[in-house]
Structure formats: structure tokens, C-alpha cells
Amino acid sequence: MTQATPQRIAIAGASGRMGQMLIEAVLDTEGVELAVALDRAGSPSIGQDAGAALGRPCGVTITDQLDALAQADCLIDFTRPEGTLQHLQACLRHDVKMVIGTTGFDSSGRAEIKVAAQKIAIVFAPNMSVGVNATLKLLDMAARILNSGYDVEIFEAHHRNKVDAPSGTALIMGETVASAWDVALPDVATWTRHGDTGVRKPGTIGFSVVRGGDIVGDHTVFFCGTGERIEISHRSSSRATYAQGAVRAARFLARQDNGLYDMQAVLGL
């Protein structure tokens, strides 16, 4: 009996915190192998072994050459929107599938990903955590039940270095509630409050943001009624959960044709 060929994985942002966790997750997962490690041009990590900083040399050298993706089956990318879109074009050139965990895209960037998914298979999700995606299912259920007489507020907290707000996870939570209410999030979202705001408008969804320290990611959705309050929370204590979910998404794509998928599809939820 012949052994199946491992899925060849590429990691973008290989020297960063998330990139290193992704590399470790790939090294720890059966059925996949690290084939390419990408980093930005000028990075001091170029030319180094991708696993050296983990104490696990793996024989894959970090490079800034996007054409190295020709040696991969799937790219996992948790970088910045502008970098991810460059990587997307390289994946299209080399017919490489893609897992995108990057957040902060504008409507144009999201549209570009959607168009690309007509030619390659893509998992695009703001949060790869299994727990977060289970939380989204709970939110959908709660929002369908608590659709009248309850005010919804979404609180999120992240580390001081996160550059986009609200987080992608908070936004998808808001979209989940809005969808259950059969409305569009932009039509009901309240992004900021300051000064004399007047009374709260029924049917709106408020957002609150904290940035500080090394908070990995906290999210709570409040359903506030008269005489009671329901809170649905998820707290991440390690980025490892995102890395493990991303590798799981890559394994899912190995069996998929072209198209745009989310983590709900990956997990069969």
C-alpha cells in the first residue's frame, strides 16, 4: 500500500508571531509538509531556516520570491491586506489554493478575493478558531429567538499591535446577528458613541473596542432585555488555536474545487 503524498503548504509572514505558529502547526500535522516560507522583501529572516527560531530546523529557507509558490499546493496567509492581495495574484498565476485569515480588507479587497475564488479554492475567514465558529452558531440561534425587545452590543479586546477595528471576528458576529434579523449590518451598526447621543435606537447593533497589552482576543455579545441580559463570550488564550484551524482549513481545501469557503464549511456546521 503506497503512502499518500503530503499536501505542500506555504506560509506567508513566516518570521512573524502568527507565521511561526503556523509553521509549528504544519510541522506537527500529519499529511502536510512545509514547502515554502515567505516573508517581506528586506526582512532580516530572508535566507534563514523557517523552523530555526522554533528550535526545529526543517530545511525550508525563508524567501521573498513569490514565484516559490509554484512548489506549494496551498498558501496560508495571516499578513496585511495589501500583502495578501499580492500573494493572491501569485497564487492565481501558479494555481495554488489559499487560506486567508487576514483581516481589515475594504470592499474592493473582499471583491478581489471573491473573483479569484472563481479560479482557485479559497477559505476566507476572519477567525479560524473552532470555538469561535461554534460561538457563531450559538449567536445565530440566540438572535433568532431574541429578535424583539433586546438590544445587542458587541465588545472586543485585542493586543496593542492590532491595527484594524472592530476586529474581523466582531464584524462577522455582527453580520451573524444582522442576518438572523434579516437586515444588513451597515444599516443597523453603531460604531462610536460620544457626547449627547440621545436614547438608544431600537434594532441597532453597537460595537465597543479595547486595544492594549498582549490580549490575544476577547469577544462578548450582549443581548440586553428588560430584567435580564444574555452574554455569549469567547476568549482566546493562544494564537495556536487559529494556526491549528488554518491547517485544518488547508486540509479541507485539498478536497475542494474552485470556490469561496468559510470556516463553517470547513467544520461542517
Swiss-Prot record:
Query: Where is it predominantly found?
Result: cytoplasm
| Positions of NAD(+) binding | G13, A14, S15, G16, R17, M18, D39, G101, T102, T103, A125, P126, N127, M128
- Residues holding (S)-2,3,4,5-tetrahydrodipicolinate: H159, G168, T169
Q: Which CDD domains match?
A: DHDPR_N
Subcellular location, in the record's words? Cytoplasm
Instruction: List the catalytic residues.
Output: H158, K162
Q: Which UniProt keywords apply?
A: Amino-acid biosynthesis, Cytoplasm, Diaminopimelate biosynthesis, Lysine biosynthesis, NAD, NADP, Oxidoreductase
Q: What is its EC number?
A: 1.17.1.8
Gene Ontology CC annotations of this record: cytosol
Q: Which GO terms describe its biological process?
A: diaminopimelate biosynthetic process; lysine biosynthetic process via diaminopimelate
The residues the record assigns to binding NADP(+) are R40
**One function term, GO molecular function aspect:** oxidoreductase activity, acting on CH or CH2 groups, NAD or NADP as acceptor
InterPro entries according to UniProt: DapB_C, DapB_N, DapB_N_CS, DHDPR_bac, NAD(P)-bd_dom_sf
Q: In which pathway does it act?
A: Amino-acid biosynthesis; L-lysine biosynthesis via DAP pathway; (S)-tetrahydrodipicolinate from L-aspartate: step 4/4
Its biological purpose: Catalyzes the conversion of 4-hydroxy-tetrahydrodipicolinate (HTPA) to tetrahydrodipicolinate.
Recorded family membership: Belongs to the DapB family.
Q: What is this protein called?
A: 4-hydroxy-tetrahydrodipicolinate reductase
The protein's organism comes out as: Bordetella pertussis (strain Tohama I / ATCC BAA-589 / NCTC 13251)
Q: Which gene encodes it?
A: dapB
